Amino acid sequence: MADTEKNLVIFDTDPGIDDAMALLFLKAQPSLKLAAVTTVFGNAETEVTTRNALYLTQRFGIDVPVYAGATRPLTIERGPAPAFIHGEDGLGDVGATQSFAVRPAEGHAADRMVEIIKANPGRVTILAVAPLTNLALALDRDPGIASLVKDVVIMGGAFAWGGRRGNATPVAEANVHNDPHAADRVFTADWPVTAIGLDVTSHCVATHDDAAQLASGGEAGRFLWDISRGYEDLYRRRNQVDGCCLHDVAAAAYLVAPELFALRSGAVRVVTEGIAIGQSIQKLDGHIFGPSAWDGHSSKLVAGEADYAGIVEAYKTAIRSLG
Ligand code: BDR
Ligand code: CA
């Protein structure tokens, strides 16, 4: 497929073990072209997630500029990075990035996002698998981008479809919880948003055997195996699953296989204060209530369920294809 026919993707990310999985999944997709990787705080500080994005793109020959973005949430204080999930270095503390020092490309992630979208009207999908701060900043810098993007696909939120609630708190998913004001800004902007939240991603489990098979198949699978030993262990203890959740991969899979997802339409708001801070709530279209904070906001799509096995299979096929 010629590059001009491919879907252009800005990958906004906080690598992060499942972010690394998603980036390698994207590399394997012939119908997608990465226009930029933009980084933000989340699984580690921005300096670390940027270094990791640079390391991953260079090690796996992904030809794309990496732009560093926000280092803190819009309004609230930055909480501690979850080293117990992704390691101090964000990639499982196996020493992958030790002594790796390459500078990101010039410019702030939010500015570059705006430029790329304006230069390619109707062609760019933002795939955001991290706190939504860069997207909110981009909207503030130029609200006009809302009508120019093709789609905004997010790994974020937990909408209690199928009873699934939070992972950062009992009601809040981590990416939304890390910057609830940014998430509310992104969900209430007048642009298309599809959210693939914990409702779906927590059912997309690559088993220990899946990971072992991929590890014996080539460098990408071996690398993912190495960095995900502690991650898998955490999921085994915390979620009682024999493997780990492919959160960010599931959102990436939506770009190439949307038929795997069942979506619900309705306005989405995010709680920005109090004990439920970071909770994401969808008011389904057609449900009638009294006046509420959801009124006047355009509908967004939220994945309620999906073909979980199909998503895991797509991931395995992608990583295998990288050799
Ligand atoms: C999300 O939070 C991060 O820790 C993961 O990379 C994923 O994007 C899951 O809640
Ligand atoms: Ca992530």
Residue ranges and their predicted role:
Residues 77-79, 163-165, 206-208:
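Short, well-ordered secondary-structure micro-motifs
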